[in-house]
Amino acid sequence: MSRPAQLDRRGFLALAPALGAAGLLAACSRTQVGTGTPKEDVGLLAKLREQGFVKVGFAGEAPYGFQDGGELSGEAPTLHRAIFKALGVPELRPALTDFGSLIPGLLAGRFDVVSAGMSITPERCGKVIFSQPEFVSPTALMVRQGNPKRLSDFASCAREGATVGVLTAAVEASYAKAAGVPDDAVKSLAKQQDGLDALLAGRIDAFALTGISLRWLARTNQGAAVEVGSPFVPEVGGVRQWSAGGAVFRPGARDLRDAFDRELAKITGDAGRYVGLVGRFGFTAKEAPPRSLRTADLCAGKGPA
């Protein structure tokens, strides 16, 4: 999981607090009278079908949404391509954007969907609307090959007296401590590669991060004598710590979002199809969101029932 202050996929950048008078007038001119809905969002799906493409914003963050040899790739674009094709929109046209500019760019109409694996948070739900979850990001442990201490979760780390590496200021430190790992056995590291290097050097016994990120780290360090364990969902105070991401739409594009959700459910509800689409990016059936995990609950700051 990423550091709270970092502007990456899971960070949050608030929009500018106020608009000038000219901006307000421009915004009014773009809305449907009596609804507050941007004009271009009325019948948006029909428009996309007619033009044959949808503009998507992405931030160039692997494995969620990035360019590979000039082609748009990653978890989100792959899912979204399949969904929009089913909706009669055969092409995704990418717009590479700084992560912090994705929501402002969406609201300004520079693209119609954010395809970046953006986490669903209450703060963002106050600005935009999300699809149902596309994935969850359970935690995992990277250990030395063979897993000599048989570590599987934070409780096993506490039991075995293991030293756990985490990213500086990341939430995994609090998860480990909540499971009983002593403060002096939790070691902070500046970046992901530092975690793998510390593990290989024997300075830590496990490196804790999301399973998705750890599998990608292992993939980009092929030949390293490490392995990534099965993902698990930590608990703090009896509350399971989920992190879920989805597609992002303007508030007026509910019809498009709802159509998107109907196709998304066909994929996330079929583990074989889900892994067949996004498995090459490090996603497994355990990253498929449970049926009980709903965007409305995540927007309210709650987990699944």
Region locations from a protein language model:
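Short helices/loops that flank or line small-molecule/ion binding pockets
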Residues: 85-86, 93-96, 100-114, 127-129, ...
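Ligand-binding clefts/hinges and TM-proximal coupling segments of bilobed small-molecule sensing domains
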Residues: 171-186, 259-305
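N-terminal secretory signal peptides and thylakoid transit peptides that target proteins
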Residues: 2-23
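Periplasmic-binding protein-like
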Residues: 136-142, 222-261, 285-304
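Flexible hinge/capping segments at coil-to-helix
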Residues: 132, 145-163
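A ligand-binding cleft/hinge motif common to bilobed small-molecule-binding domains
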Residues: 117-126, 175-178, 205-241
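Extracytoplasmic small-molecule ligand-binding "clamshell" domains
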Residues: 36-117, 126
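Extended ligand-binding regions for polar small-molecule ligands
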Residues: 29, 77-86, 147, 155, ...
